[in-house]
Design a protein with these regions (language model features):
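Gram-positive cell-envelope targeting signals
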Residues: 1-35
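Hydrophobic alpha-helical transmembrane segments of integral membrane proteins
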Residues: 11-12, 68, 219
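Active-site-adjacent loops and short helices of periplasmic peptidoglycan-processing enzymes
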Residues: 28-176, 183-187
């Protein structure tokens, strides 16, 4: 079981704050006509990975369900906090979970690494449940940790009720929030390696990746597909070309691969990253900060 660290205590405080905020906030997804209107929309955003510079967006602040792209947050917490080489016994509650599955068996031994790859390559809902229990002791406690981590990342219009993305009226995000979560995840070396893997042969399981972008888009680096009837087709993608990496989110988009490719194409065709040496950076009050650092800015090509 995950032992609370100083960051864990911070997450607990964030979770309590989230509960207070939810008592006074009603996102578009959760209100009668507003909810129906939101669910009929698609949303998208594209951002440069490191700076968060927005390249394109549409309905990026509309609250929507996100299906299995939820697992980006689940995986991030596992990558940050768990020993991937630890061998565990599959918890009973992870056997026979609804939806996509890696077909875990009662009493089965498996390491956390194979569960993580099963989560992100095969979208196993049973794997998500097992990892939640391994990390936090229970699914409910894990969702508290997910919500706290979302707040730490500035995803204030996001709320998780489960680690897999199964439909629930109180389980939602926005394209902007999900992009912030994905950008943080893609800067974690372990996460990045997992979602960029096409085929995995582990100690206990072998998987192929469902994400077609890895096979069909030049420079693709990740990250996660998702689908439920309620959420529609959802995809978080990332790709790198010419020293620039872009992350895109599309929610409730029938042609999720085509839309993601179009967002990436637009970004690479119209923007570039400039890395500028910054010898003297001053803060308010005249205090010198970070001499010799490099400044990273996103520029429109030809500007």
């Amino acid at each position: 079981m995950y032992s609370p660290s100083r960051r864990g205590k911070v997450r607990l405080l964030c979770a309590l704050l989230a509960a207070v905020l939810l008592a006074f906030t009603v996102p578009a997804l959760r209100t009668g006509a507003g909810r129906a209107d939101a669910l009929s929309r698609s949303a998208c955003i594209s951002e440069e990975l490191y700076s968060g510079t927005v390249l394109q967006e549409s309905n990026a602040d509309v609250a929507l369900p996100m299906a299995s792209t939820t697992k980006i947050m689940t995986a991030l917490l596992i990558c940050e906090d768990c020993d991937l080489d630890r061998v565990v016994i599959v918890p009973d509650c992870a056997v026979g979970v609804e939806g996509s599955s890696i077909y875990l068996k009662k009493g089965e031994e498996i390491d956390v690494r194979d569960l993580l790859y099963g989560l992100m390559l095969r979208s196993g809902n049973d794997s998500a449940t097992a990892l939640a229990v391994i990390h936090s002791g229970s699914v409910d406690k894990f969702t508290d940790d997910m919500n706290a981590r979302a707040l730490e990342l500035g995803a204030k219009s996001t709320h998780f009720t489960n680690p897999s993305g199964l439909p629930d009226d109180d389980h939602y995000t926005t394209a902007r929030d999900l992009c912030a979560i994905a950008r943080a995840a893609m800067q974690n070396d372990i996460f990045r390696k997992v979602v960029g893997t096409k085929n995995w042969n582990g100690a206990y399981r072998s998987y192929s990746n469902k994400n077609k972008m890895l096979y069909n888009y030049d420079g693709a680096t990740g990250v996660k597909t998702g689908y439920t009837m309620k959420a529609g087709r959802c995809l978080v993608s990332s790709a790198m070309r010419g020293g620039m990496e872009i992350v895109t989110v599309v929610l409730n988009e029938y042609d999720m691969y085509g839309k993601s490719a179009a967002l990436l194409d637009y970004g690479f065709e119209n923007y570039e990253v400039a890395v500028l040496p910054v010898s003297r950076v001053f803060l308010c009050g005249g205090r010198l900060c970070s001499p010799g650092a490099e400044g990273r800015i996103v520029l429109r090509k030809g500007s």
